[in-house]
């Protein structure tokens, strides 16, 4: 070993300090734009979501356009109607799309609609939810819907805890490997509950 080190035994270095946990950032909605032109254009022309569906969520304060980058902002609220979650989706129709939850968002409070009957539809993304409502517009407001903003089941479980009348769950996750894996996991969680 001395031959490799050139007759030096080397130096010892102190171990790195353990990484400190940073406190979670407080949740804050991105500032809204003065209008929603780009969001309406993107959702209606690019994604073919109906004007009625977009307008419903915009008037409810659950969908708007952010001022800085003109992203779609999908707002999730708690049981008191206080915003606790926001999902950003770029309105860029060319190039790579951008999707992210705003820092400090609570995953259990993602974008949702609470209806009066016992049926809950579960989606991966808010735009999947809006597209479904466009395809099946008849009395859609009677049912409940939640977008997981990913494949975690926290938002669905929160909806079921808050709304005890919800008895039937329809999983509408993507038909890809992550979506199908999540669907199986969530189905098992529901059967165990």
Map each language-model feature to its residues.
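Acidic beta-strand-to-loop metal/phosphate-binding motif
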Residues: 122, 166-178
């Amino acid at each position: 070993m001395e031959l490799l080190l050139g007759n030096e035994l080397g130096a010892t270095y102190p171990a790195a300090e353990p990484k400190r946990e940073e406190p979670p950032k407080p949740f804050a909605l991105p500032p809204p734009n003065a209008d929603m032109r780009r969001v309406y254009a993107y959702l209606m022309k690019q994604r073919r979501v109906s004007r009625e569906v977009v307008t419903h969520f915009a008037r409810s304060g659950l969908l708007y356009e952010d001022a800085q980058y003109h992203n779609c902002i999908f707002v999730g609220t708690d049981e008191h109607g206080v915003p606790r979650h926001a999902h950003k989706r770029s309105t860029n129709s060319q190039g790579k799309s951008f999707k992210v939850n705003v820092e400090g968002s609570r995953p259990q409070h993602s974008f949702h609609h609470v209806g009066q009957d016992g049926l809950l539809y579960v989606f991966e993304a808010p735009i999947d939810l809006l597209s479904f409502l466009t395809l099946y517009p008849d009395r859609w407001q009677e049912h409940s819907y939640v977008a997981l903003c990913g494949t975690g089941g926290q938002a669905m479980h929160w909806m079921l805890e808050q709304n005890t009348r919800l008895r039937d769950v329809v999983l509408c996750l993507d038909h890809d490997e992550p979506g199908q894996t999540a669907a199986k996991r969530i189905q098992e969680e529901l059967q165990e509950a």
